[in-house]
UniProtKB/Swiss-Prot annotation:
Keywords: 4Fe-4S, Cytoplasm, Iron, Iron-sulfur, Metal-binding, S-adenosyl-L-methionine, Transferase, tRNA processing. The gene is miaB. This is tRNA-2-methylthio-N(6)-dimethylallyladenosine synthase. Residues 3-120 form the MTTase N-terminal domain. Its cofactor is [4Fe-4S] cluster. Monomer. One of its GO terms (cellular component) is cytosol.
Amino acid sequence: MTKKVYVKTFGCQMNEYDSDKMVDVLNAAEGLEKTDTPEDADIILFNTCSVREKAQEKVFSDLGRVRELKEAKPDLLIGVGGCVASQEGASIVARAPYVDLVFGPQTLHRLPQMIDARRESGRAQVDITFPEIEKFDHLPPARVEGPSAFVSIMEGCSKYCSYCVVPYTRGDEVSRPLDDVLTEVAGLADQGVREVTLLGQNVNAYRGAIAAGSAEIADFATLIEYVADIPGIERIRYTTSHPKEFTQRLLDVYAKVPKLVDHLHLPVQHGSDRILMAMKRGYTVLEYKSVIRKLRAIRPNLSLSTNIIVGFPGETDADFDKTMALVHEMSYDTSFSFIYSPRPGTPAANLADDTPRELKLKRLQHLQATIEENVARISQSMLGKVERILVEGPSRKDPNELAGRTENNRVVNFPAPSAAHPRLIGQMIDVKINHAYPHSLRGELVLAHGDASAATH
């Protein structure tokens, strides 16, 4: 019987990418297949996030639930990876003795060896070292399902924002060699991938050697240009970027590379220069707005999303009002917004914070309601327009329909004959938007005369 692995992912797209790699590594080493049911698994892995306290505590809550599975199946292996593992290390085993494996984001490629050591010794294995970017040299070729894929181009972050734990859990910035990234993207294109999302904690800080050992360095703009030249790749996205790393070279790429989508996720974190300075973000609101102004001069239809922290220590009503003014001015399409969560070991955790929780919550609700109004307005503005979408697969709402994604990252559900589904999935097609919902759109196929009969048979 084929053994199975269950992976639960917390946090960002980097973690989603790493979770896929965990499955690939275990499939190559032991033939394990992925399952969505922990009860069916021989190995259960939690890929964790420590950006906010709530996500960290959720991990231990979930560990408590799978403890019963281990009691019923003693050979079941339980592992904790990701940023909580990197931060907590062996203390995870002390708190949850039934955990067998603890590994950091940089050591997931060592899972097969850790599993062997656990089985031979009977003792929990902990490896949370930072072996630079070694893991990419030991990962098997990606196995993908669907026309979209993530590609990690770098690890870590060297910005050391005062509130952020990432540099401590993932290390400083290290970029993959250019040829290594291009080889992975070309392999994905050969498997039918049409859209890639380039990933990094600070992705536009990419500075990769042209090839391993080479002294010649490629910047992020160069990487995008090369990826755009790979046959089969029709769309390029990236996340997460930093305003301080938005170079003129990167701005120029938006004018030269149409495959780079009209959508940008550029975290601002706050609208007050005073708070940005306390956060150690390294830019002012005016500098941030200057980047967006230049981008929108090149791409007038640019859709913009961001991250915003509410209730950072010392935030006043005036500071929050500046954030709201920026939200209105930028017309953000989406915002990942949260109440500030102090993380142990970060400088901001030592700042005095006398703002009542109720006031922070009120500010957050006001911010999120405003963003939702923006989302609704932008969705309504798309009614009647023809949008180019990449068809990703059956709709989650109705498997008899198909779903795709627009350049500005909107999901569009549309009817199509079942017989046409295999032909349409993975294709770039035109749809006319005829309904707007809070978090999705509905459309209908727009076909040239010669395509009409093929799509309906």
